[in-house]
């Protein structure tokens, strides 16, 4: 057990030393933030919704990233590397690529669309892509679930209190 403990302590010391060596003088670190498809897709969707000027170079990078992480196995986008198909992530990535300018009949887009349709269509996605699609007029607002405003008046012990949602 002592040998394992020494090995663990040495690994922790090496890891901490490597992190401290990478730390900037003002105390922060700069590392690549790897995310699933939803973060860059939502960024594109938000920029377009806000009417921000198109940054073609940035959009090209994001489009390449989204195309690169599309699953060859299920043709959609997972929530983590090599993960299972996630319909909501796939809807967002597909729509972001479409917004960037990828043709809907491009092979990667056709495969993604077929995967979404096979999983029940856009209506099978969670509330977030439904809201985004409704914002762009690509989906009905009636598909977005509503919360009755009276729930705000419910006491904390109530089973469906806002603090529990």
Regions found by a protein language model. Give the residues of each.
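Preference for long, amphipathic alpha-helical scaffolds in soluble/luminal domains
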Residues: 1-165
